[in-house]
C-alpha cells in the first residue's frame, strides 16, 4: 500500500515544530536544568558540611563560593558562544546579501558579454563550398550557424579569396588538377553550372530560375563544358574582382570581349537564347552626387545629416545577403532608389535639423525627389549619371559589402 503525503502538509508540520514545539521543549529543558542544578548544589553543600562538623559554616561558605564561580564561568561561556553565534549569523546574512547584490549588478550591468563566457561573432569566416558536385554558382559564403544578435563583421563575411574558396570541377577526380589550371590561366575563376542545385525558398529568391526552370536548360548547360557563363578577373590597380557575365547557347555562339574585360559578353542563337542574371555595383556617393544640387541646405535647413539618412535608407533596402533586387533598367532603377530614400526620409525623425530650420514637408520633399529623378534621367547631371551608368556596365560583382557604402542591384530575367 503506497501512502502519498502532500508536500504542503510536510511544510506545515515543519513550521509547526519550528514555531511551537521547539520553544516549548526548550523551556521544559531550562526548568528541569535549573531545578536539578539547585538540588545538586544543596546536596553537595549539606554533605560537605556534615563531613567537617567542627567548621560547618566555613565549609558552606567555601562551597557556595566555588559553585557560584563555576556557575558564573559557565554562564559567561554560554553568553560568549551565544554572542559568537549571533555574530556569525549576522555575518552570514550580510555576506549573502552582498553576493545577491553582486549577482544582480552583474546581470543588469552594461559589462561586455565576453566576461560571462559568451562569444562574439566579430570574426565570422565564410563557410567552405559545398564541394565539386553540389556547389551552386550563387551560393553565398555565410556561416549557417551565426547568431543574428551578434555584431557581424561584414568585411570578413563578404571578402573572400576566389582562388582559395571556389574551385571549378567537372567531376570529383579533377578537383586538384582544375584548381592548379585555374591559377595558371588569365581567368582566375571558372566554373560550370551544376546539374543539380538544391531548391529552397532562399535559392528561389537569390538564384535565377532560368537555370533550373526546365530539364532542357539543364541538359544544355551540361553539354557546354567549354563555355564559361561567368569569368572572374582581378583588377591589379584596384584589387577588386570583376565577374563577367556571358549569355550563351548550345549551337551558333559568338563571343565578344573588350580590352578591359568589363563589357557584358552576349552570345545569340536563332532558336534559343540563354541569359544570365547580372549584378551591378552602385556606390552611394554617386547617387548622393546627383541629389546634392537639389537638396541644398538653404531649401530645407538640412545639413550633412541628409547624406547620413540617405545612406541609412539605402542600407535598410539591403536584404540578408546585402543585395537590392530591382529591374536592370535605368528608369526603374532610379525610381526604386529615390522612392525608397523618400520613404526613409519621411519616416526618420532624426533628419530634422535642430538649428532653427523647419522640417521639409511631404509635398516639397516629394517634388524635389521627382525633380532629381527627372533631371537625372534627362541628363542634367551628366557627370554623376555617367559615372553611375559606367558603374552599372563595368563593375559586375556577384556580391558587395552593403554597410560599407555600396549597394547591389540585381536583374531577374
From Swiss-Prot:
Residues 264-277 have a biased composition (Polar residues). The keyword Secreted does not apply. Its main location: membrane. It is found in: Membrane. Keywords: Glycoprotein, Membrane, Transmembrane, Transmembrane helix. Signal peptide: none annotated. It is a single-pass membrane protein. Residues 250-277 are annotated as: Disordered. One of its GO terms (cellular component) is membrane. Coiled coil: none annotated. This is Uncharacterized protein R474. The lineage of its organism: Viruses, Varidnaviria, Bamfordvirae, Nucleocytoviricota, Megaviricetes.
Amino acid at each position: 500500500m503506497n501512502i502519498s503525503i502532500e508536500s504542503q502538509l510536510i511544510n506545515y508540520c515543519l513550521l509547526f515544530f519550528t514555531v511551537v514545539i521547539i520553544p516549548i521543549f526548550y523551556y521544559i529543558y531550562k526548568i528541569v536544568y535549573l531545578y536539578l542544578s539547585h538540588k545538586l548544589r544543596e546536596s553537595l553543600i549539606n554533605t560537605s558540611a556534615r563531613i567537617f562538623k567542627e567548621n560547618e559554616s566555613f565549609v558552606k561558605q567555601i562551597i557556595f563560593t566555588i559553585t557560584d564561580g563555576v556557575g558564573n564561568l559557565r554562564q559567561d561561556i554560554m553568553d560568549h558562544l551565544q554572542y559568537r553565534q549571533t555574530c556569525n549569523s549576522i555575518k552570514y546574512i550580510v555576506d549573502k546579501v552582498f553576493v545577491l547584490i553582486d549577482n544582480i549588478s552583474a546581470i543588469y550591468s552594461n559589462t561586455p558579454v565576453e566576461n560571462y563566457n559568451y562569444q562574439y561573432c566579430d570574426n565570422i569566416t565564410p563557410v567552405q563550398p559545398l564541394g565539386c558536385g553540389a556547389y551552386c554558382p550563387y551560393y553565398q559564403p555565410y556561416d549557417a550557424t551565426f547568431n543574428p544578435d551578434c555584431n557581424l563583421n561584414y568585411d570578413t563575411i563578404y571578402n573572400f579569396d576566389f582562388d582559395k574558396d571556389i574551385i571549378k570541377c567537372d567531376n570529383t577526380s579533377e578537383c586538384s588538377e582544375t584548381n592548379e589550371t585555374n591559377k595558371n590561366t588569365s581567368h582566375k575563376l571558372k566554373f560550370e553550372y551544376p546539374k543539380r542545385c538544391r531548391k529552397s525558398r532562399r535559392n528561389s529568391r537569390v538564384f535565377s530560375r532560368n537555370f533550373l526552370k526546365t530539364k532542357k536548360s539543364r541538359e544544355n548547360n551540361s553539354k557546354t563544358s567549354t563555355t564559361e557563363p561567368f569569368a572572374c578577373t582581378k583588377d591589379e590597380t584596384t584589387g577588386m574582382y570583376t565577374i563577367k557575365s556571358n549569355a550563351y547557347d548550345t549551337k551558333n555562339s559568338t563571343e565578344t570581349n573588350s580590352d578591359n574585360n568589363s563589357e557584358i559578353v552576349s552570345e545569340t542563337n536563332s532558336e534559343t537564347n540563354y541569359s544570365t542574371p547580372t549584378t551591378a555595383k552602385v556606390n552611394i556617393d554617386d547617387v548622393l552626387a546627383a541629389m546634392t544640387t537639389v537638396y541644398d541646405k538653404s531649401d530645407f535647413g538640412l545639413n550633412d545629416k541628409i547624406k547620413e539618412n540617405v545612406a541609412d535608407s539605402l542600407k535598410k533596402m539591403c536584404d540578408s545577403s546585402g543585395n537590392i533586387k530591382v529591374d536592370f533598367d535605368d528608369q526603374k532603377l532610379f525610381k526604386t532608389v529615390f522612392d525608397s530614400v523618400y520613404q526613409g526620409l519621411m519616416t526618420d525623425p532624426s533628419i530634422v535639423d535642430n538649428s532653427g530650420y523647419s522640417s521639409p514637408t511631404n509635398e516639397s520633399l516629394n517634388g524635389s525627389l521627382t525633380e532629381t529623378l527627372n533631371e537625372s534621367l534627362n541628363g542634367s547631371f551628366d557627370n554623376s549619371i555617367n559615372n553611375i551608368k559606367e558603374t552599372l556596365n563595368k563593375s559586375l560583382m556577384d556580391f558587395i559589402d552593403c554597410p560599407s557604402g555600396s549597394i547591389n542591384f540585381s536583374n531577374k530575367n
